[in-house]
Amino acid sequence: MALDVKKYPFIKSLDDELKKYGGGITLTDLLLNSTTLIDQAKDRIQKTKSGDELPHYVSYNEPVLVFYTTLLSLAILNDVKLIRRYAYAEAKQFRSLLHTENEENLLEISKLLDLKINRCDPIKFYLEKKRRIIQKEFCVHFIDYLKYTKDLKEDWKLSGQILHKGYVYLDKNQLIGLIAESIKSKIVEMIRPLNLKEIPEKLKSLIERRGIIPPCIENILAKEKLNEEEIRTLITFYIDIGKGLSGIVSIMKKYNVSNVEDLYRKYRGDKGTRYIVYSCAKMKQLGLCVSSCNVKNPLQLYFLSNE
């Protein structure tokens, strides 16, 4: 079965993806024409910062372009720690998909990542602690194994592996682990070569743009205790700007709100029931408006502040 590029967009080059738009079209051209891809990329980056799981790429209309737009965005932001966190989060997301793949697809992905892993004659051994027979049918030369696992934990030490005639034998879970580690390294490497001098200032501005927190939200954040409407306003605001559950829990911690997770699920809802932050008119009725911002909704100030 052929690999699904919608699940693993890194297996397709950006140049190949852009061919469907005709000659001469660049990613920059597409991004300057519409901010949808930038918004989706920034959402992935925000989820990384918040510690939330990244959505699978199959949820996007243009998964390959979202992938490369995110890499471009990270290169422009130029935050080494964030890049590493993102690569880790992506590897984790891809790893969950790898567990659903058959062995042929796993070996194909390994090949695309330049991992020298092969299917070998199965080797069986008795694991005394677990009192069962273990079978491993993938193998990699020990020199390559050391290279692939140099940044991994103790469990991956060569001394703890099955070594036979110069080859380390792996089971399916170990194979997936090496693929995920290779994906993480590949993502970091793919960000480095980007030539930032060739990126228009307008595009840099779109990616680097950070919204201003509205005065009404700042005023609520400054309080020591919150009433029900203030709690609702904060949670819906942060949901609407893309902050994940863990980030919202962290913000609400100081107010001793015990049911943040339940409120998050309630206000996030689905497409038919999702809540949005109150309009400025409603905020005035509730006594939560503290400034004349000349907008109809606090979200306008956040999203349009630096355009």
From Swiss-Prot:
GO terms for biological process: DNA replication, synthesis of primer. It holds the Pfam family DNA_primase_lrg. Keywords: 4Fe-4S, DNA replication, Iron, Iron-sulfur, Metal-binding, Primosome. The keyword Hydrolase does not apply. Its cofactor is [4Fe-4S] cluster. Signal peptide: none annotated. [4Fe-4S] cluster binds at residues 216, 280, 289, 293. The keyword Iron applies. GO terms for molecular function: 4 iron, 4 sulfur cluster binding; DNA-directed RNA polymerase activity; metal ion binding. One of its GO terms (cellular component) is primosome complex. Binds 1 [4Fe-4S] cluster. It comes from the Archaea. Belongs to the eukaryotic-type primase large subunit family. HAMAP family: DNA_primase_lrg_arc. Heterodimer of a small subunit (PriS) and a large subunit (PriL). Regulatory subunit of DNA primase, an RNA polymerase that catalyzes the synthesis of short RNA molecules used as primers for DNA polymerase during DNA replication. Stabilizes and modulates the activity of the small subunit, increasing the rate of DNA synthesis, and conferring RNA synthesis capability. The DNA polymerase activity may enable DNA primase to also catalyze primer extension after primer synthesis. May also play a role in DNA repair. Possesses a template-independent 3'-terminal nucleotidyl transferase activity. This is DNA primase large subunit PriL. The gene is priL.
